[in-house]
């Protein structure tokens, strides 16, 4: 047995390349910046700028769909040129330079524009970065690699709202001052990817792809890949924007100062669970883990509807974070293993386009149900879609194993 194989079997927490750690730290810093803003943005839009819950849902859905559409082309371009890092750096750079727009924005239109451009940056970097993680990860360790990156990414999403809470207190609920501080970690992330991440050489024997989005190349993605996409799409319909968790907390009566605790709590559970879940997915049935994640999402939705007060809110948020930890890195690992190495960028781009459209629909449906029926209808609909995804997973479980 080789030393690398022995390490993989006995020490699943060690032996991942430095590049994966560096990419995780880049993601962490950018998420500190983004979540400092995102934790406050729904309330800032509704309280400060007079937007409705439906408007918040539309804004969030369009923003994420914009990112998803961009990922298709950046992922395909990374396959065509055989390079991932440069496109990822452009995406992080674009996100960094748009951050100052949030504190400077005088109207809702400016905030929406900043949010959309920020998501374009996310779209440009997303597929090439995920393909780069897959390229760097040792064979049989992709679940652990994606779990590590997801954990560090989510650690940033945990730190960001905590900073937002402290700064909202320090700045006497001045949203714009908090948004200015959020500019700093965004530019630190840009510097880190430029100088600390090294792309591996293209492996010998990997063919060059002239047009990754051609019909012939898309057919090479294979049936297992499209099965993963199908399951993830229905799953995404059940998992609308976390902005509605924030609005639910405000509805229950959580004070403005403590609103960022919603994302702090969710992301703490997400960060702690993502890496162990990734390691576990390298060692057991991934469909079983997906099914468990769907069950946790259903439980989270029901708790947020049925359990009273702050205790129910806290439990629902924790279950939501745990379902994210179990499923998000797992889906990324399934995509990496389902497709040829030379088409990974395209595969991630198509995956994110389709699930991004589903997220747009999910957020619009969630916002409409909230506005016209009530918050309970939003979470009950999410539980219903999660149950449908679980039913759809049953006939696909052998194909995904």
PLM segments and residue spans:
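Cytoplasmic membrane-interface "Motif A"-like loop-to-helix N-cap segments
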Residues: 80-92, 283-294
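Helix-loop boundary and gating motifs at the non-cytosolic
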Residues: 10-64, 225-262
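C-terminal membrane-cytosol helix-exit motif in multi-pass small-molecule transporters
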Residues: 183-205, 389-397
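Transmembrane alpha-helix termini and helix-breaking/packing motifs in multi-pass membrane transporters
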Residues: 43-48, 159-177, 361-375
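Helix-to-loop junctions at the C-terminal end of transmembrane segments
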Residues: 70-82, 168, 273-285, 370-371
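Juxtamembrane intracellular "pre-TM" segments in multi-pass secondary transporters
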Residues: 2-17, 199-231
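C-terminal ends and interior cores of transmembrane alpha-helices
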Residues: 93-106, 295-308
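Cytoplasmic helix-loop-helix junction between adjacent transmembrane helices
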Residues: 114-155, 334
